[in-house]
């Protein structure tokens, strides 16, 4: 798991106007919370934070005002829906050795059996519990040779040592569908529309 060091400043200005001023300076407003402490409102460096968030479940080592060092993981990231820049981030305070609940991305590898099958992600991220400094970046699942009707459940996924499922083991994560079955309703709808027009 990667750890990124960021310098943060506490902030005392709040509201939309203050947030706009912070973003204009290429910084991002954020909140650090957890362990029963009061939320701490922060200003974080925009570019460095953006680079850090490219890694899922990144561990962030915060140097706050040059006085306090804390570890955190991102819990909620708000982006501008059009331009994509960071608007706000919520960080969860963590301690080394502490177990946290997170979602790790699921990555399928391998080729499905020949015959025009589609792979559907029922869950694109798997809820797990892991030690805060050892959160996997992703889990990889082999789908090689699977045919329509096959599914992979949460309990079928091999997890790294120290990582436990935080979801029912019978939860379907991936399933294989027949491409022809997916196309059939579309053709039927087209015929119905043609009949209606006639």
Curated annotation (Swiss-Prot):
Q: What GO biological process terms does the UniProt entry carry, in alphabetical order? A: translation
Name its species.
Streptomyces coelicolor (strain ATCC BAA-471 / A3(2) / M145)
Supply the SUPFAM superfamilies for this chain: Ribosomal protein L25-like (SSF50715)
- According to UniProt, the name of this protein is Large ribosomal subunit protein bL25
Record-stated family: Belongs to the bacterial ribosomal protein bL25 family. CTC subfamily.
The cellular component terms of Gene Ontology attached to this UniProt record, alphabetical and capped at eight, are: cytosolic large ribosomal subunit
Among Pfam families, the record links this protein to:
Ribosomal_L25p (PF01386), Ribosomal_TL5_C (PF14693)
- The answer to whether keyword rRNA-binding applies is yes
Matching entries from NCBIfam families are given as:
bL25_bact_ctc, PRK05618.2-1
């Amino acid at each position: 798991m990667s750890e990124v060091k960021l310098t943060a400043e506490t902030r005392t200005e709040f509201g939309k106007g203050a947030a706009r001023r912070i973003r204009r300076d290429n910084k991002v407003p954020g909140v650090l919370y957890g362990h029963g402490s009061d939320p701490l409102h922060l200003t974080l460096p925009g570019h460095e934070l953006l680079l850090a968030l490219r890694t899922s479940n990144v561990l962030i080592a915060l140097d706050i005002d040059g006085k306090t060092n804390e570890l955190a993981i991102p819990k909620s990231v708000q982006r501008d829906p059009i331009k994509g820049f960071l608007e706000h981030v919520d960080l969860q305070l963590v301690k080394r050795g502490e177990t946290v609940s997170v979602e790790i991305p699921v990555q399928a590898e391998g080729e499905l059996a020949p015959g025009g099958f589609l792979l559907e992600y029922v869950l694109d991220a798997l809820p797990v519990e892991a030690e805060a400094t050892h959160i996997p970046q992703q889990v990889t699942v082999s789908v090689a040779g699977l045919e329509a009707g096959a599914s992979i459940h949460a309990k079928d996924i091999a997890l790294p040592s120290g990582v436990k499922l935080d979801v029912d083991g019978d939860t379907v994560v991936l399933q294989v569908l027949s491409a022809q079955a997916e196309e059939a309703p579309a053709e039927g709808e087209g015929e119905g529309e043609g009949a209606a027009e006639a």
